[in-house]
C-alpha cells in the first residue's frame, strides 16, 4: 500500500515517468481462479499500480511469467537464477549434484539450473495440492534417481515451508546424501522457521527481495543480496532504455 501511495504522490507532483521496482510481486500465486468466486489478485495488483500512475514495473522471479501480461505497460522480469547458481556452484561437488523441482510445474526452471551448472541431472517430486486448503500439499513420489546425490531443491518462494520440508524428507527417504534448498523469495510465514530448523536440510539459500528480520534468521540460512541485479537493471533502463540482464 505504501508503494501505491508513493506512486500516487509522484504522479500528482507531475513526474515525467514512474518506474515501480517491486522485487517481490504481492499475491502472485493468485494468478487465476482455482475455484468459483475467487479473486485474481495478481491482476488486481497490476491494475492498482497502473491506476496509481506507474508507467513501468520491475520485478524479480514472478510465480508465473504470464503475470507480465496483466500490466498495461513495460514489465522488466528479472531472474535471481545466476546469483543462486553461482553461489551453489561454488559450494558443492558438481559431479554428485542433482537439481530437484518440488513439483512438475517448475521442471523448466530446474532445466535452466542444470544448464548453468554443467548439465547435472534433474529430478522432481509429484505433488498434489487441495485448492480448498491454502499452503498445504501432499508430497508424493520422487521422480528421478537421487541416491547418494547432493540435491538442490529449487523454488520461487518459501512461504510456510510445508512443501519444501516434505520434499526434503522425501529425498532423504530415497537415499539422498545431502539436501540444500534454494529460493528467491523468503516469505517465511507461520511455522516456516520452526519447520526449516527441524528439517534435515543442510542449508537454505534465499535472496533479500523481502526483508528478513533478525528473529527469523538461523544458522543454516544464507541470504544473498539482490541489490547488484536491481542496480544494473535500473541503470540500463534509465541510461539505455532497455534491459540486457
Give the residues covered by each predicted segment:
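PRPP-associated nucleotide enzymes
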Residues: 1-243
Amino acid at each position: 500500500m505504501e508503494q501505491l501511495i508513493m506512486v500516487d504522490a509522484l504522479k500528482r507532483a507531475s513526474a515525467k515517468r514512474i518506474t515501480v521496482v517491486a522485487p517481490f510481486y504481492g499475491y502472485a500465486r493468485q494468478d487465476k481462479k482455482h475455484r468459483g468466486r475467487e479473486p485474481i489478485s495478481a491482476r488486481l495488483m497490476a491494475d492498482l499500480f497502473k491506476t496509481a500512475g506507474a508507467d513501468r514495473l520491475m520485478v524479480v522471479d514472478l510465480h508465473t511469467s504470464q503475470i507480465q501480461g496483466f500490466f498495461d505497460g513495460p514489465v522488466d522480469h528479472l531472474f535471481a537464477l545466476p546469483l543462486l547458481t553461482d553461489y551453489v556452484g561454488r559450494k558443492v561437488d558438481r559431479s554428485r549434484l542433482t537439481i530437484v523441482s518440488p513439483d512438475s510445474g517448475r521442471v523448466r526452471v530446474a532445466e535452466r539450473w542444470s544448464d548453468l551448472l554443467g548439465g547435472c541431472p534433474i529430478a522432481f517430486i509429484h505433488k498434489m495440492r487441495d485448492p480448498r486448503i491454502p499452503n498445504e500439499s501432499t508430497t508424493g513420489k520422487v521422480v528421478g534417481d537421487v541416491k547418494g546425490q547432493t540435491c538442490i531443491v529449487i523454488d520461487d518462494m518459501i512461504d510456510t515451508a510445508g512443501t519444501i520440508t516434505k520434499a526434503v524428507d522425501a529425498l532423504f527417504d530415497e537415499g539422498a546424501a545431502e539436501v540444500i534448498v534454494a529460493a528467491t523469495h523468503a516469505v517465511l510465514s507461520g511455522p516456516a522457521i520452526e519447520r526449516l530448523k527441524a528439517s534435515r536440510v543442510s542449508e537454505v539459500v534465499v535472496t533479500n527481495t523481502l526483508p528478513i528480520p533478525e528473529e527469523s534468521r538461523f544458522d543454516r540460512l544464507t541470504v544473498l543480496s539482490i541489490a547488484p541485479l536491481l542496480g544494473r537493471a535500473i541503470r540500463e533502463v534509465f541510461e539505455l532504455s532497455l534491459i540486457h540482464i
